[in-house]
């Protein structure tokens, strides 16, 4: 006997509708976008605050060490965002599918807990092989916090996906803000008491407990956390694995780029600290809100499943417009902002900042086409696009050019490979 898929089974409860608005209820409607947009703005400001405090408190040499850990945590949690993407797709798609009433069910939050525990073991167990190359200082503390922080973030990302899939955008935004505020509070305390590098490493991972705080304080969040989706755990994990691989590849370019830069350079030093800060500042205005709105975008593309290429046009135009303004602003006032905000040691050229902003537009476009591919369940194409972009960027970083030039070339040209892969796959589904 088939039942309407909008009836999602909760753990230990009867069927419950997918969100208060139903599956079709406005993933990019003004209300949901406003709530997530506000949360994104707060999150971005908090992220800037942490980076500002670290850059002001640490010299460029020290900031390059912090930047690598910040990037390493961004890399592994970016991969864990594959759980957010797959959970959003699974929950959201229920409004368009019929499922067997007698079929097996999967509890995404429990599965993500197992994934997080497994990730902790893998990172900690393998750390003797790679941590010495990546972490120049506070090596074992960095490994411990990276492992534990990732385990918590797996649950965080899955809970975000369940909230996005059920249109609980207020709670979605609150979870984002809780994560960001916890980070900036720890960073501010570090700045005041002079905890230096170790304190900023703690601040990077401190927000990984936000999911637990939300579960303890928010009944709607607890209701979403109890949801189960149709299908076996193995089926969910297969889809999540593709998303995690692709999200991991995307995280290398988006958050983990300092790690890639470190691995392809003999020594970063003060120049590396300046480049890492420049990359972070130029991409954040585009990529922070875009990454935060992954749930909205995937839900939107699921709703527009018959014309996904056309559905890309409006957000792509918005990204292009914002990017053009950003390039101009970065070239005109960027060097001055870096000197005034972070100190005279952080000297950067107008051309570098403008080109890095253009590179951020390329990665933003790749993020957008990737969200459309996830919504279409094109997991292989999604993975291939991001992996291709990452491999391309990594190879370009090996060119015998200056650090600034090869950084721009890698971040600008590598994403074009992935965009092409995604668009070809999406075009075939629309035929």
UniProtKB/Swiss-Prot annotation:
GO cellular component terms given for this protein: plasma membrane
Topological type in the membrane: Multi-pass membrane protein
Domain of life: Bacteria
Keywords: Cell membrane, Membrane, Transmembrane, Transmembrane helix
Location of the protein in the cell: Cell membrane
Entry annotated with the keyword Amino-acid biosynthesis: no
Family: To M.tuberculosis Rv1510 and M.bovis Mb3654.
UniProt name for this protein: Uncharacterized protein MT3732
Native species: Mycobacterium tuberculosis (strain CDC 1551 / Oshkosh)
Organism phylogeny: Bacteria, Bacillati, Actinomycetota, Actinomycetes, Mycobacteriales
């Amino acid at each position: 006997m088939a039942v309407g898929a909008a009836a999602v089974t909760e753990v230990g409860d009867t069927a419950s509708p997918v969100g208060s608005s139903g599956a079709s209820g406005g993933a990019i409607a003004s209300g949901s976008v406003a709530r997530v947009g506000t949360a994104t703005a707060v999150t971005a400001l908090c992220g800037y605050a942490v980076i500002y405090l670290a850059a002001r408190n640490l010299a460029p040499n020290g900031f390059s060490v912090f930047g690598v850990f910040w990037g390493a945590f961004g890399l592994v949690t970016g991969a864990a965002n594959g759980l957010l993407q797959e959970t959003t797709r699974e929950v959201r798609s229920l409004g368009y599918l019929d499922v067997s009433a007698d079929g097996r069910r999967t509890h995404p939050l429990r599965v993500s807990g197992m994934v997080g525990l497994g990730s902790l073991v893998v990172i900690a167990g393998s750390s003797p092989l790679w941590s010495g190359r990546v972490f120049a200082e506070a090596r074992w503390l960095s490994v411990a916090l990276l492992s534990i922080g990732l385990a918590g973030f797996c649950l965080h990302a899955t809970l975000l996906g369940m909230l996005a899939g059920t249109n609980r955008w207020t709670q979605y935004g609150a979870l984002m803000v809780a994560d960001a505020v916890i980070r900036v509070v720890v960073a501010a305390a570090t700045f005041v008491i002079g905890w230096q590098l170790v304190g900023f490493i703690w601040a990077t991972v401190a927000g990984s407990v936000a999911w637990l705080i939300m579960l303890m304080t928010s009944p709607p969040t607890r209701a979403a956390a109890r949801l189960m989706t149709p299908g076996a755990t193995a089926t969910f994990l297969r889809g999540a694995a593709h998303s995690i691989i692709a999200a991991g590849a995307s995280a290398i370019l988006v958050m983990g780029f300092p790690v890639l830069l470190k691995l392809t350079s003999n020594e970063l030093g003060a120049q590396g600290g300046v480049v890492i800060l420049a990359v972070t500042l130029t991409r954040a205005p585009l990529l922070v809100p875009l990454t935060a709105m992954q749930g909205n975008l995937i839900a939107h593309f699921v709703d527009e499943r018959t014309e996904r290429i056309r559905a890309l046009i409006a957000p792509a135009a918005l990204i292009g417009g914002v990017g053009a303004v950003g390039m101009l602003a970065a070239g005109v006032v960027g060097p001055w902002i870096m000197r005034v905000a972070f100190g005279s040691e952080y000297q950067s050229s107008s051309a570098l900042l403008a080109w890095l902003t253009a590179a951020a537009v390329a990665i933003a476009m790749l993020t957008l086409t990737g969200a459309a591919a996830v919504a279409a369940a094109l997991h292989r194409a999604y993975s291939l696009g991001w992996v291709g972009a990452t491999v391309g960027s990594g190879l370009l970083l090996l060119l015998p050019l200056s650090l600034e030039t090869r950084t721009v070339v890698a971040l600008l040209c590598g994403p074009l490979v992935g965009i092409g892969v995604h668009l070809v796959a999406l075009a075939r589904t629309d035929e």
